[in-house]
């Protein structure tokens, strides 16, 4: 990881604290993983505070595959089975079947419809019957141990929400460039400056949790 690009955002603990403050204010944060892993940056919002405008930004500036990071408990509450029985993806990303709210949506594709689906899935009294399957929102199951168990964006997202005192559910999407290629750290930092968002790494979250 090119730490010089991250230096303006402080040390690892300061970067996490800045992200937690932004999330509590309903803002987005950018989380990058290691250069020898996916080497990608994800734009992350709290599912609890997510707005239609923020979803529109995710769809417009990112890959379009908007994922909802959920705890194992919530996955079980919603009875969401894994997308495949034998997950042989490179990093073991734990996709479940995709979902759509049964009420309050049209085709399910618009920013507003996707937000409606996410709010239905994270409601305290959410039931399996509240959701149609498949749909246009892609749930991801976070490992119970968070980034200390798996150093992925899914776990980093849920860990950040817990550390911020929010519901343990977050929304992520990979930042892409106008030509469709993946944004790397220099472009992530530029994106952060344009949108006034903090930047941090998965390793920062690991370091922060190890101080708890």
Swiss-Prot record:
Pfam families: DHBP_synthase. Pathway: Cofactor biosynthesis; riboflavin biosynthesis; 2-hydroxy-3-oxobutyl phosphate from D-ribulose 5-phosphate: step 1/1. It comes from Shewanella pealeana (strain ATCC 700345 / ANG-SQ1). Keywords: Lyase, Magnesium, Manganese, Metal-binding, Riboflavin biosynthesis. HAMAP family: RibB. Catalyzes the conversion of D-ribulose 5-phosphate to formate and 3,4-dihydroxy-2-butanone 4-phosphate. D-ribulose 5-phosphate binds at residues 37-38, 42, 150-154, 174. This is 3,4-dihydroxy-2-butanone 4-phosphate synthase. NCBIfam families: ribB. InterPro entries: DHBP_synth_RibB-like_a/b_dom, DHBP_synthase_RibB. The gene is ribB. GO terms for cellular component: cytosol.
């Amino acid at each position: 990881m090119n730490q010089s690009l991250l230096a303006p955002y402080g040390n690892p603990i300061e970067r996490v604290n800045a992200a937690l403050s932004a999330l509590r204010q309903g803002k987005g944060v950018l989380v990058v993983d290691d250069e020898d892993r996916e080497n990608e940056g994800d734009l992350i919002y709290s599912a609890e505070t997510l707005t239609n405008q923020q979803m529109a930004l995710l769809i417009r500036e990112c890959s379009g595959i908007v994922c909802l990071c959920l705890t194992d408990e919530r996955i079980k509450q919603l009875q969401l089975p894994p997308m495949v029985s034998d997950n042989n993806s490179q990093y073991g990303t734990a996709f479940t079947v995709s979902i759509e709210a049964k009420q309050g949506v049209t085709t399910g594709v618009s920013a507003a419809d996707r937000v409606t689906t996410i709010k239905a899935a994270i409601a305290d009294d959410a039931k399996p019957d509240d959701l149609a399957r498949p749909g246009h929102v892609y749930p991801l199951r976070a490992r119970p141990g968070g980034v200390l168990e798996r150093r992925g964006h899914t776990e980093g997202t849920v860990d950040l929400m817990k550390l911020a005192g929010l519901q343990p559910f977050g929304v992520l999407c990979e930042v892409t460039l106008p030509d469709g290629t993946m944004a790397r750290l220099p472009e992530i930092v530029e994106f952060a400056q344009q949108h006034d968002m903090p930047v941090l790494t998965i390793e920062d979250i690991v370091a922060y949790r190890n101080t708890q």
